[in-house]
Amino acid sequence: MFIGIVSLFLTVLVYLGAKKVYQRFPRVYTSPLLVTPAVLVGLLLLVNVPYESYNLGGGLLTDMLQPATVAFAIPLYKYFPVLKKYAVEIILNVAVGSCIAIISTALIAKWLHLGTGLIDSLVPRSVTTPIAMNVSEMIGGMPAVTAVFVILTALLGTVIGPMVIRYFRIDNEIARGVLLGTSAHGAGTSKAFELSSVSGTISSVSMILAAIMTLCAAPFLLSFM
C-alpha cells in the first residue's frame, strides 16, 4: 500500500515537473505526455519496482480519466448556440474522420502483417484513453498496448495538426476544432483551446463524438476486414 501511495504522488510530481519544463521549452520531445512515462519507467527499472506494485497507486489516476471528461460539459454549455448551428457539419466530418482512422489503421497494420491482437489494439488509437481501452477490450485487443498508441497519436496530432492548419491556412474556428479533436482527442483539445475557446469547445465535442462513433463503428467495420 505504501508503494502505491508513493507511486501516486510520484506520478503527479513528475507530470507537474514535466509540464513546467514544457512551458519553458515547448518542444515535441519535452511534452509531458512523452517525458512523464519515460521518467516513470526509468525510475521503476532503477529501483526494481514491478508494474503491479506501481499500479496500486498510479492506477487511481487512470480511474479518474472517466469522471474527468465531465469537465468538458462547461464549454459545451457556454457555446451551445454555436454547436447547434454547426451540428450537421460537425457530426458528418467527425463520422468520416473516425471511419477513415479505423479503416486506414487496420489496412496499414494488415499490410505490415501485424498480428490480429495488435491490429485490434491499434484501431481505437484516435479516441480518448478510457473509451479507447474499452473498445480495445471489446474487439479483442490489449488495452495497455492501446493506451501507448493513444499517447503516440496524441503527440503526433498536436504536432502535425497545427502544421496542417498553417499550411492549408485554415482560419475557420469550427474546422480547427474538428480537426484537432477528431485526430488527437484530449491533447488535441488542449491545443485547440490555445488557439481559441470556440475551437477548444468544438474540439471537445468532436472528441466525444469520435469516441462514440468509434465505439459503435469499430466492431462493425472490422467484421468486413
From Swiss-Prot:
It is a multi-pass membrane protein. InterPro entries: CidB/LrgB (IPR007300), YohK-like (IPR005261). It comes from the Bacteria. Keywords: Cell membrane, Membrane, Transmembrane, Transmembrane helix. Pfam families: LrgB (PF04172). Its main location: membrane. This is Uncharacterized protein YwbG. It comes from Bacillus subtilis (strain 168).
